[in-house]
Amino acid sequence: MAAKDVKFDTDARNRMLKGVNILADAVKVTLGPKGRNVVLDKSFGAPRITKDGVSVAKEIELEDKFENMGAQMVKEVASRTNDEAGDGTTTATVLAQAIVKEGLKSVAAGMNPMDLKRGIDLATVKVVAAIKDAAREVSDSAEVAQVGTISANGEAEIGQQIADAMQKVGNEGVITVEENKGLETETDVVEGMQFDRGYLSPYFVTNADKMTTELEDCIVLLHEKKLSSLQPMVPLLEQVIQSQKPLLIIAEDVEGEALATLVVNKLRGGLKIAAVKAPGFGDRRKAMLQDIAILTGGQVISEDLGMKLESVTMDMLGSAKKIQITKDETTIVDGAGEKAEIEARVAQIRTQIEETTSDYDREKLQERVAKLAGGVAVIRVGGMTEVEVKERKDRVDDALNATRAAVQEGIVVGGGVALVQAGKHLEGLTGDNNDQNVGISIVRKALEAPLRQIAENAGVDGSVVAGKIRESDDLKFGFNAQTEEYGDMFAFGVIDPAKVVRTALQDAASIAGLLITTEAMVADRPAKEGAAPGGGMPDMGGMGGMM
């Protein structure tokens, strides 16, 4: 085992604080509408330019092991905030730095670190409750756009596109962000349920120009197993022909004679029909077939339930206003399922989302909710160069996460003002002893740090701005760093999601509390320069004559 270096007491804490400061100073320059960019070197390709706090934090690795430990702990703050709220990583980093700085000063002055931490925790609980009380619901699409705009560093176009996408697919809908090949940023919306399976034969195509199959007012047969013969289905097919409605068959596979029979019937014009494979694999396939059944108001023909194709009747089939099939995708629009049943299915899947521990499963379950509840929107981010596209994509991702958070827990005044106003609720809060009271005052002072940083990044004195806002009794009064004006932040459109502000503070206080209570640090001792791995070879002098 390698030898270890151990640092204690003030030496350990000072090293750790240096690492915290290096990382936080690099991240906090990005905060606010006039925050600067950070350029990240990449081992291949062009450097990456970003204003995303967590992207900057993740790149930082320090040479000194003890400083690096401090930096990594603050990196954890940014990562956790990003995972929970999707935005607010820079705010969380600034808060963590402010709490750690003041906390370590108090420890150096002889205060008990554990009591300081208890005071910090007491204050955090109180402020989080105040933020939740101050939050109000997002009232309209314009406010969604404002949240997106603020998070995208003031780019109104991004905020508007996210608001439009959310309006079309609903708050539960899936919105994905991709890179566009062109210069423009575009939004495509797929309403209804879409899955990645196309037609099994090009002979099913009804629109030869677009190479798509379009079925209006269509009935849907859902079968769990493979179809290799249509013989058992003949009575059903005769009823379908009489109904004069197109039929879509979704099964594990349709092959051989069954597929040939369908194609021949389609070409002769006797039957308007198409067949696609069921989406997914294994248990997920069964679940998705059940989703489609609920969406279309039909039943899955499953041998597990004792159903046979021979006994299928028309009332077991689902239906939809429109179904469009390309060679790769099938979209079911306006299924005939009961609204109450669809809502019950969505609630059931949500329960599974809460219980699952796998990120992959959670993502797939969320997709299923979106397909049942709303639809899918894709925002394709464009730009002049690859570097610009990547930088804008970061901002769109942040803005999208912020708008989702706003819809979940409501909005508060932006620009760091919500934290300062919530801090006023700490007046009169006392701990069990003086050291805990100091912990409370550390949080109160730290709550001003994001506001000060936003002001300083805009070239204004942060202390003056913080003082003016502290003195005001109007909870909406704040400083708009974009225009350098004071006034009603809601009227300016400067708003933040309550969830982002709350999460940033909770994560910052949690990690900062751990750093303050650190008394010793252990790290690998660096290897001595020049020593060969095996202790070096003995001198080989005098052997020059060997052949």
From Swiss-Prot:
What name is this protein filed under?
Chaperonin GroEL 2
| Assembly behavior | Forms a cylinder of 14 subunits composed of two heptameric rings stacked back-to-back. Interacts with the co-chaperonin GroES.
Per the UniProt entry, what is one GO biological process? protein refolding
Gene transcribed to yield this protein: groEL2
Bias (Gly residues): 532-547
Q: Does the keyword Coiled coil apply?
A: no
Q: Pfam families from the entry? A: Cpn60_TCP1
Give the top-level enzyme category: isomerase
Q: Which PROSITE patterns match?
A: CHAPERONINS_CPN60 (PS00296)
Renumbered to this chain, region (Disordered) spans 527-547
Highest taxon in the source lineage: Bacteria
Question: Reaction catalysed by this chain?
Answer: ATP + H2O + a folded polypeptide = ADP + phosphate + an unfolded polypeptide
Transcription regulation in keyword set: no
EC number in record: 5.6.1.7
What CDD domains is this protein classified in? GroEL
Citing just one GO molecular function, the answer is: unfolded protein binding
UniProt keyword list: ATP-binding, Chaperone, Cytoplasm, Isomerase, Nucleotide-binding
Question: Which residues constitute the signal peptide according to the record?
Answer: none
UniProt-listed NCBIfam families:
GroEL (TIGR02348), PRK00013.1 (NF000592), PRK12849.1 (NF009487), PRK12850.1 (NF009488), PRK12851.1 (NF009489)
Q: Where does ATP bind?
A: T30, L31, G32, P33, K51, D87, G88, T89, T90, T91, G415, D496
GO CC annotation: what is one?
A: cytoplasm
Q: What does this chain do?
A: Together with its co-chaperonin GroES, plays an essential role in assisting protein folding. The GroEL-GroES system forms a nano-cage that allows encapsulation of the non-native substrate proteins and provides a physical environment optimized to promote and accelerate protein folding.
Protein family according to the UniProt entry: Belongs to the chaperonin (HSP60) family.
Cellular localization per UniProt? Cytoplasm
